[in-house]
């Protein structure tokens, strides 16, 4: 049976202005992971997002038919509404962005993370420490946490999020940051260790120009809303959910 993906639980974030927007081929996740994003709270309506191609039409006299082709692509205008939160840092940033001509990075985080996967593991005391988890299926950069009935080796702390590096079919090491250096373990350990993935939902990144920051009114029983329309000015990068069972 088909799976529905509700909008409920999604969040929208805005970053600081940029001077240049990369070409489509250069839109990669690392451009955005270093950005300090601020959530725009009170999101009431999510606008459309994604490419649409322009239509090229030429009327051919001899055939009596129009020929059509796809032209340039446009990621559209995202027409968002927010309940008014005057002291919200994200709404303040959105309103300030409308007053400029700059492009801003945006992040959409959806609430569709898969269930976490858990397994007992063994950990070597070595440089780097190696975690053994048979057929773990984890990828580099995937997030995991550890728990134990005893003591983890020095270098690892229970409940802290680590990131997979150097994965093989049945083993991997971890780093303190995505793509960081593998952690060396030392000392002694005891008990049974458990690794649990830290799943993330779908994330979309893009650059956009904030075109409006208007207040919408209505009748007496209508709440005032902040209308924040964003002209998407780049390709939209979609990062699929990771870290689930």
Language model features: what each stretch is:
Residues 32-36, 52-71, 87-92, 121-136, ...:
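Surface-exposed ligand/attachment interfaces on beta-rich extracellular proteins
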Residues 63-113:
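Structured, beta-strand-rich domain cores
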Residues 109-116, 198-239:
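Short beta-strand and beta-hairpin "edge-sheet" elements
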Residues 13-25, 107-111, 145-149, 163, ...:
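Predominantly extracellular/luminal cell-surface or secreted proteins
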Residues 2-84, 202-203, 207-224:
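Solvent-exposed edge beta-strands and adjacent loop segments
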Residues 1, 10, 22-37, 91, ...:
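Charged, amphipathic alpha-helical segments and their flanking helix caps
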Residues 116-203:
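Small/polar beta-strand repeat architecture
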Residues 83-85, 109-111, 145-150, 209-213:
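Generic short beta-strand segments
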């Amino acid at each position: 049976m088909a799976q529905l993906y509700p909008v409920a639980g999604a969040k929208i974030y805005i970053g600081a202005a940029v001077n240049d927007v990369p070409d489509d081929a250069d839109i990669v996740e690392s451009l955005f992971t270093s950005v300090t994003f601020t959530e725009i709270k009170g999101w009431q309506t999510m606008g459309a997002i994604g490419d649409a191609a322009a239509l090229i039409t030429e009327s051919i006299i001899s055939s009596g038919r129009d020929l059509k082709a796809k032209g340039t692509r446009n990621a559209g205008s995202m027409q968002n509404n927010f309940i008014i939160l005057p002291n919200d840092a994200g709404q303040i940033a959105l309103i300030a962005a409308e007053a400029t001509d700059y492009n801003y990075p945006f992040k959409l985080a959806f609430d569709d993370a898969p269930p976490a996967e858990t397994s007992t593991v063994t950990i070597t005391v070595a440089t780097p420490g190696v975690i053994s988890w048979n057929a773990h299926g984890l990828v580099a950069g995937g997030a995991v946490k550890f728990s134990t009935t005893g003591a983890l080796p020095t270098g690892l702390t229970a409940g802290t999020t680590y990131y997979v590096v150097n994965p093989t079919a049945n083993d991997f090491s971890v780093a303190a940051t995505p793509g960081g250096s593998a952690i060396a373990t030392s000392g002694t350990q005891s008990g049974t260790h458990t690794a649990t993935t830290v799943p993330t939902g779908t994330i979309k990144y893009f650059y956009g120009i904030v075109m409006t920051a208007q207040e919408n009114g209505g009748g007496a029983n209508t709440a005032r809303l902040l209308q924040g329309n964003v002209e998407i000015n780049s390709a939209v990068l979609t990062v699929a959910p990771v870290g689930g069972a």
